[in-house]
Amino acid sequence: MDSKDTQKLLKEHRIPCIDVGWLVRPSASTSKSSRPGKSESKANSVAPDIQMDTARPPVFETSVDSSSSILSSNDKGRRHSVAASLLMDNQRANAGSTSVPTNIPPPRGRSKSVVETNLSNVEADSGHHHHHRHHHHTEDAPAPKKVGFFKSLFGHRKKDQEQQEKERERKERSPSPTHVDRGAAIRRERTATISAESPPPLQYNAPPSYNDTVVPLTRSKTESEVYYENHPQSYYHGRMRTYHSPEEGKVDGTSPADDHNYGGSRPDPRLMDFLRYYKSKDYKLAAFKEGNFIKSSASPTTKKNRRASFSLHNDKPQPAKSLAHQKFDAKGRPIPPHPDAPKLPSAFRKKHPSNASIVDTVDSNSDVSSSAQNNNQTPSSHKFGAFLRKVTSYGNNNNNSTNASSLSANVNNPDTSSTSLWSSSSMEFDPSKITTVPGLENIRPLKHVSFATNTYFNDPPQQICSKNPRKGEVEVKPNGSVVIHRLTPQERKKIMESTSLGVVVGGTGQLKLLNPEEDDANAKSKEEMAPQKQNEVEAHDEEDNNSQRRNIVMAAAEAAAEARAKEAPNELKRIVTNNEEEVTVSKTASHLTIDKPMISRRGASTSSLASMVSSDTNGTNADDEGEILPPPSLKIPHDIVYTRCCHLREILPIPATLKQLKKGSTDPIPILQLRNPRPSMVEIWSFSDFLSIAPVLCLSLDGVQLTVQMLRIILSSLVYKQHFQKLSLRNTPLDEEGWKVLCYFVSKAKSLHSIDLTMVPSIKTNVQKPSKSSLKSKILRMQCNLENRSDMNWDLLTASIALMGGLEEIVISGAKMNSAQFKNFILVACIATERLGLAYNGLSKSQCDDLAKWMVQSKVTGLDVGFNDLNGKLSSFTDAVLGKIQKANEKNVFKFLSLNGTNLRVNEHDTFENNEVLKLISVLCYLENLKFLDISNNPAIFPHCVPTLIDFLPVFVNLVRLHIDYNNLSSTSVVMLAEILPMCSRLNYFSMLGTELDLASSKALAEAVRKSSSLMTLDVDYVYMPENIKEKISLYALRNIQGELKRVNSDDKDIKDSQFSSLQDQLSLLLTEKADNSEHYNKMVENFMAKIALARIKISKVVHDLFDLKLNGQLNLEGKEALIRLCFIEASLERGCDLLKQRHNNTLKSPEAVSKSRKGGNQAQPNSESCQRMLLSSSILQNSDHIALMPFGSAIVEKSSPDAEDAVEFREGDDSNVNHEDVPANDQQFRDEVDIKNKYSIIKRELEHEKLVGGGDLPVDKEILNRAAQSLDSDQIKEFLLKNDVSTILGVIDELHSQGYHLHHIFKKQGNQEETAFRTKDEQQSSQSNDSSANASPTTDPISTGSNTSRTNDNAHIPPTDAPGFDKFMNNAEENAIDAAYDDVLDKIQDARNSSTK
């Protein structure tokens, strides 16, 4: 065929195609080639981007078959292969809309010519078009052949039927009769030049993706896995192209398509449809768990079997055919279409649903669908395929045929099935019928073979290689060369004596089948005739006798063997070998010992099992009738199970894993960590064997580098576990394939509650240092971006979580998703999430808005947004909290909030009305269940945030844990916070790391622990704290722990809290409880406001008198402490009233107005007893338990257990404060006893003093109060004011006033000259220290232990620690420091009061 004919055909818009009928038709017409002779040429192919021009009639490329070069004379076998047949079938299908001219000569079968491909550029007015123009060079046609075997195999339909079929297909694909867009399918097809001498592999047309690739022909099973691992899938073909809108890349029309790119690939449109379907459920969890998408899910599909057959177009999608499409048999007769749905139920047995859904059937790249399509197109190929399946199929032929028929029905006519993923009316993708997330169809199911636990009753006998094997004569060098070293008998003897022979483990089983039945019967009769054992001593003696008897038998056997060897003839003693010296094994070498196990305590494992069996059988004989070994209900300890799992894999147990298992324990394992950062495959297998049967609640793979296969093995052992709850993958590398495996696991693991996918390099993981052998390993492990997980396909994980019903806890720190992915994740994946970790995510304003919207709609209890720049973005969270409060008939369950390192700022004159941080703190008071608050690493909010914290912290009645770490607090701020801590009635944990403490702040913290009855943990930098203050804090913490244990163990529910329980609980109740009965609720609020007004009147009068006394310089230290406490109480009550007014839209009366109305209407003011009768109680405040699974939750005090083995050790620094004059120098035990007695006496005095002043649960004793007032004991009066409720404080003030005593008289300095001189000296020292502190840091204080320079300069003023007056000096120094700090606090309070009155 010359170039003129080609040009003529192009002008007629007809695409020629080589007719391959010469393979089977003997009467095929022949013609001479335009270029006679055998020629070899190289083909040049260029693949520019092709664009269609609608103005000019399109010019199509010629689709010329290259089988003439492939089926060359040098390779006759390729003509008979299935690849050739499939190639011709697919070529007929690709030439669907073209007419085949009859004057094209067929090529010769033995021709070595190649197909040359040229391109002609056709330019139009609107654009440039590039099309392939092929020039074919053929030779003389072969002689006619007889009808043979290929006639029946490759018989094809008649040409008129083929043309009719192709015309129908073209009309179906065409959007209109006048416009045929065939360039979309042609522009991605490429032709390749194949050399005749050394032909490369067959080329096939890749699927229409965004990155066109050409993949060589491989087996369909291997190719489909390799191709889809490295190339993004695309589903813009068939009917789906008409379904998606032009804004397919946008999600809800808000985000561009570029936001969904994952590593350069565009999103899957089916996945976007899937997410849109879930978002249409309007945030209702019931719609996900019990909605229509599960009820109408796709029917179980048959399992897809991959056959090892060749396929040319595995990945080429086939257009869906309409219902009107007719099929024809071999004789051209039409085949009626299959009915839409059967009228009767199926008679076949239903199979279990496989992981592959029907979507996988439509878009699968396996040869099953390809062969099914080819079978429907060409009946003759079906015969040849059936012939090959008998030879090369690896599965069941019946299943293959069933799958092929079902797949062909689904592929060719997807509208016929009622359970299809395609809508019958519009051919749209239906996400409601999905059983597998789009994009995970090709993931193989996770399967793991596990044994029952009692299988490990018998330790499997294994021979484990020695750790120090003996060296042999053969040495293999790294370059592959082999060197043989001849050893002398002396060298061999030395090696045998100095090396071990490995470890023999196992063999402790009691298998009855090992003994014949006759021997068992004889043994039974002998045991029945034998007398029973009298005691354990006789049993032990018998065991010794048995061991001695065995040793005697072994020695006799050895002696007999040596005697036989001596009596044997010489020619039998020696085995002659070629040029090899005789080697004899000495007696020493024959008795070599074996390696010892790495864990010594595992030696008693078998005995423990034997003891358990004996205890279970209650002394009965082990060989009794009906006894089953191993016992079916026997619980084997976890350490033994793991050891035997390792023995099954012929390795010793890994110590890092074995140490985490408590010896002899069968309880559920809270957490199990894989601590080897680069584990081997055998370690993974043994670890997964143990995971599959052990009750592990949480698995940590933090910082472990795995391969995809290793990850599959581990997840396969967890996917079907019933009680597995959490999977932690912090800083674990995951590539694209590993991410898909993880998503598949999440979609299938029904018991999974929590997942941690943190990727933050600064977070440390609990892994070991990698070994040298693991570093030298060449195993290709997963690699990814170690800074964050921004390149992961988060939409795929979103769909996986949504499909399994949601997760309770999700931690994705360092995810850094874009806006579209984040919105999908929050609105779809977190629909059932209660705890969400979003640290290190770089949240934007729009993402914060989406998160706040989700908070209002969800049941979230904990939120971590740490290390995100939230400056100017907190208004969304504030509105979300207010929105949750305003929701009717729903309880606010928010408990945990972390704002760690969020770049928050508070200026000097900001208030909660104009600053978002202060407003959020005030709004958090409405959360009655708030237990955890973290505002660490925000130094810009201090010190101006301290007054707001002081005002609102007492309102947080259920606050359990507070963190303000690394905020560079000043000493005055620390003292103010320490004074407010006792007012937090349930605060158990207070952390203030990163703050340098001076003597005053240390003393204030110690007093805070002493005044509080709930504070048990004070987490500060104790390096700046003197030793005596450390001891006091430890003693006060022990006292509080004892009180908490007493409260837990007590059955009396009427015990009230000792710290402001009445007013605080009442205020919290009024702020948070729903006003179901408006009249009753308003009456409660009015009574509370009246009580607050009366309390503020009395407290303000006392505060005014004490401030006047301070201005005159007559207020003592106890008075200053009481004054600070009263000021904080007054401010807290005022803030509570403001919050009540804000909630009721300022309709309530102010406390002053209420007090005036009460005074005018009723002269008699209610006393303290009547105030106590007005207290409210609510059941809401009783249920305030912490969630144990939270990473930042505090420990719950539980009842003591006799099996508890952990103990808390309180370390003491030195014993310099204890007088050891009468103690021997070397008697350490006696010194410890003295320390314990001293500490116990201190605790006893503290408890007695509390009982004396009415602390704890005892009421106030009026007689003791009168005696204290008469003696002007200011310290005891202060304890009355600090250790009781506000209403009790009011009663104390009224009682003192009735007796004629006033607080400004009691807290006035006494006229003692010695005390006055001491105070004067103290003021001078404090002024000097203040002057020096202006130019130095707090660590340069003379008393501080953190500065060596200050010690050397002030050495003369500090007595030695072993001096008799050291304790008195330190006490005076502490009082002086805290007195100066109290003055600073009172000055600031006075300034704030003056500024508020202006």
Curated annotation (Swiss-Prot):
Query: Compositional bias (Low complexity) spans?
Result: 63-73, 357-371, 396-426, 605-615, 1325-1337
Q: Provide the coiled-coil residue spans.
A: none
Q: Where do we see the Glycyl lysine isopeptide (Lys-Gly) (interchain with G-Cter in ubiquitin) cross-link in this protein? A: K221
| Annotated segments matching region Tau/MAP repeat-like | 1227-1258
Q: What InterPro entries does this protein's entry cite?
A: DRC5 (IPR052410), LRR_dom_sf (IPR032675)
Biased amino acid composition, Basic and acidic residues: 159-186, 521-538, 1208-1223
The entry's keywords = Acetylation, Cytoplasm, Cytoskeleton, Isopeptide bond, Microtubule, Phosphoprotein, Ubl conjugation
Q: Where is the composition biased (Polar residues)?
A: 27-36, 91-102, 114-123, 372-381, 1160-1169, 1338-1355
Annotated source species: Saccharomyces cerevisiae (strain ATCC 204508 / S288c)
Query: Which cysteines share a disulfide bond?
Result: none
- Other comments on record: Present with 279 molecules/cell in log phase SD medium.
Q: Which domain of life is it from?
A: Eukaryota
What are its GO biological-process terms? fungal-type cell wall organization; negative regulation of microtubule depolymerization
Reported function:
Essential for the formation and/or stabilization of microtubules. Binds to microtubules in vitro.
Question: GO molecular-function annotation terms?
Answer: structural constituent of cytoskeleton
The protein in question is named MAP-homologous protein 1
Task: Region Disordered: list its residue ranges.
Answer: 21-77, 90-144, 156-186, 191-210, 244-270, 296-382, 395-428, 515-548, 605-630, 1148-1169, 1203-1223, 1313-1372
Q: Which residues carry this modification: Phosphothreonine?
A: T222, T577
